[in-house]
Amino acid sequence: MGEPATDWRQERRSGLGAIAVSLVVSITLWLALCRLMPPLIGMDKLSARMAVALKCLAVATLFTLVAGVEAVAHERFQTSAFDPLEGHQTKRLRVNLRFLQNTLEQIVIFAAGLFGTAFYLSSGEAMRAVPATTTVWILNRFAFWAGYHRSSAMRGLGVAGMAISLIMLLYVTARVGHDIAGVPGTIILVGLYLALEAVLFLKTR
């Protein structure tokens, strides 16, 4: 009984290292993109900001979700896994299926955060964050995918993608709270989420 626990803890330590690398690289890249990218034109209009968010989401969908669908389809077509009902699955196919499912979940969160962030960013300089964030998110999806093919721990290389979506949603939630009740509204809404997160964390210990 002791051996699996030891292996699990070793995997977790490796995963934490991968997460640290992911966060450092992602933050550095995001800051560089925001600094080097020229300001977007015409961002004083809400419709223009929503259009930018929609374009970014379309690109992200193509390079992540559609890529995952294609990977699974090609694997089905060219291997003994052709008939899903037969249950023949290679390790590569199982990883691709996990990537596809995870990306489907993550892209919903990302989209909500992206459009919400674009709603509140009212200048061309600030709106550089939208394509910069999209670029970093896409790269994190690929890092998750490639890392997962190496080991379960190495999928942590893409964890910054989830952090990006969460940060955007927290920013939007804070702004919504401020719109409703000023600073107290922000504190209440963000505080409620953090309390929920704490409960979920404690329940799994």
Go through each PLM region and give its residues:
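Core segments of transmembrane alpha-helices
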Residues: 101-116, 167
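Membrane-helix interface/capping segments
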Residues: 66-90
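Alpha-helical transmembrane segments
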Residues: 47-67, 114, 118-121, 129-133
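Hydrophobic core of alpha-helical transmembrane segments in multi-pass integral membrane proteins
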Residues: 19-36, 61-72, 170, 187-203
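Alpha-helical transmembrane segments and their immediate juxtamembrane interface regions
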Residues: 130-165
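Small-residue-rich segments of transmembrane alpha-helices in multi-pass membrane proteins
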Residues: 24-26, 91, 157-172
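Hydrophobic alpha-helical transmembrane segments in multi-pass integral membrane proteins
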Residues: 28-32, 166-182
